[in-house]
Amino acid sequence: MFCSRFSVTLQLDKLYSFMGFFGLFSKEKKETLDKGLQKTKESVFGKLARAVAGKSKVDDEVLDNLEEVLITSDVGVETTLKIIERIEQRVAQDKYMNTSELNEILRSEISALLIENNTDDVDDFEAPLKSKPYVIMVVGVNGVGKTTTIGKIAYQFKKAGKKVYLGAADTFRAAAIEQLQIWGDRVGVPVIKQQMGSDPASVAFDTLSSAVSNDADVVIIDTAGRLHNKIGLMNELTKIKNVMKKVVPDAPQEVLLVLDGSTGQNAFEQAKQFTKATEVTSMAVTKLDGTAKGGVVIGISDQFKIPVKYIGLGEGMEDLQVFRRNEFVDSLFGEAK
């Protein structure tokens, strides 16, 4: 038995090493993901175990309890009802279903939802860029970890051998400019900035001009995180986009919305506001390591039909990961299969 387990462990170590060599999912990244989702896993499956206690089959009461578990885990009402409906259809087909099968059914339905809106072919930082410079405009409210996310993305791209420029176009807060400069110094990449109160579009223009002149591979533009005036936000982001196109015609190639996963339903409201203000093409969900609200990743991806590209799992530079749906589900369910 020991030899068998040792052999399996050795083979897994070899597999993770092989995957890590090709920039895929290393053993260390898997361990970070497992640790980051631990609170969510314990919360969801603790509630689920209580919901099915004493039940031998999946009936209406079990499904009602499961619905409550998912909603209180911040999966969201719409997505929860979609999952419950799909499980009901499977129960109707199978006629009799043990509660012991519920974890596996739930796992498969969550996987199916993530497949609909997320590809496992998301480029890692080492992958060739679709254009040069590849311009990412980052949006999100203050306090969600936007600047930290920008810094970590810059670090990962630089580590992968890319030349990175940062643009401090959140000119409404002196602290935002200072924080981005601190990250630029820490990572070792240039930060293009102007004084507080300057025109954000002007900063974006200067950043792209400098990046093109210096043959940069990646440009990341920070923007103001104000939601109190949706029309003003929309106009500002549109102006930044239009000005960037004067330098790089197809910029920005990506509009990344950063959301704080620990805020649960608040993140849904932020996503709603920003998707109305501008075309968001990808999302980063941060601070998942300190919360039991990891279900928000499932709900937001489903409701807004926008892929989650990054997840934040800790304070370390390496703790921002490219989101891979299969590994996410594996870590979420773990031994609860």
Label for each model-derived stretch:
Residues 179, 199-214, 228-334:
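Conserved catalytic-core segment of NTP-binding enzymes
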Residues 24-25, 331-337:
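P-loop NTPase catalytic nucleotide-binding module
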Residues 224-226:
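Short glycine-rich anion-binding loops that position phosphate/pyrophosphate groups of nucleotides
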Residues 34, 38-169, 176-196, 204-211, ...:
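Primarily NTPase-proximal linker/entry elements flanking Walker-type ATP/GTP-binding cores
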Residues 21, 122-124, 153, 269-270, ...:
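Short beta-alpha junctions and helix-cap segments that line functional grooves
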Residues 9, 13-49:
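N-terminal accessory targeting/assembly segments
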